[in-house]
Amino acid sequence: MNYISLFSSSGIGCFGFKQNGFECIATNEILTKRLKIQAFNNKCKYDTGYLDGDISTKEIKNKLFTEIKKWQTEHKILEPDVIVATPPCQGMSVANHKKTQDEIIRNSLVLEAIHIISLIKPKVFVFENVAAFMNTKCGKDGEERKISEAIKEELEDIYDFQTQVINFKDYGAHSSRS
């Protein structure tokens, strides 16, 4: 089994996939120092799988599709098994009462992940974020809608999906984020 990680920070959001034998096709993070942590931990099979930059740019998307094609050729996969996306939560978190316009604009990065999922069509996709994630408004070209509506509009013809709020404290984490 394999996966792609978007907005992956230092790789914690998909650590369980790697720990359970999944192979990383590609991982994307905008901050180089965070991606270096993933490389230090040998997250991806190939060095070219570490995609350093903004996922909304054509350059990074092209690198992502190049990695997928490499795996289709060398590993005979049809499509990735999983895409896990952990978009920035600063503009979504109820703990952040002083949201700036930049943080709110970051909410719309999730639209990039939704669109990439619709193009790649992995067997499964996972969004990990704060409890308010699905009700947070995002927008593109002046049109605002809830993230849940954006997911439904772009992915409901391809996937059956469900949402669930999980508190990782119930699974061994030492703090609660709810």
What are these regions (language model features)?
Residues 3-58:
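SAM cofactor-binding core of SAM-dependent methyltransferases
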Residues 64-80, 90-178:
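Class I S-adenosyl-L-methionine
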Residues 4, 82-84, 126:
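N-terminal Rossmann-like NAD(P) cofactor-binding module of classical short-chain dehydrogenase/reductase
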Residues 1, 21-22, 43, 100-102, ...:
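Generic structural signal for short, solvent-exposed loop/turn connectors between secondary structure elements
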Residues 37-39, 62, 96:
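Short, glycine/acidic-enriched capping/hinge loops at junctions between secondary-structure elements
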Residues 41-82:
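Short, structured active-site "lid" loops
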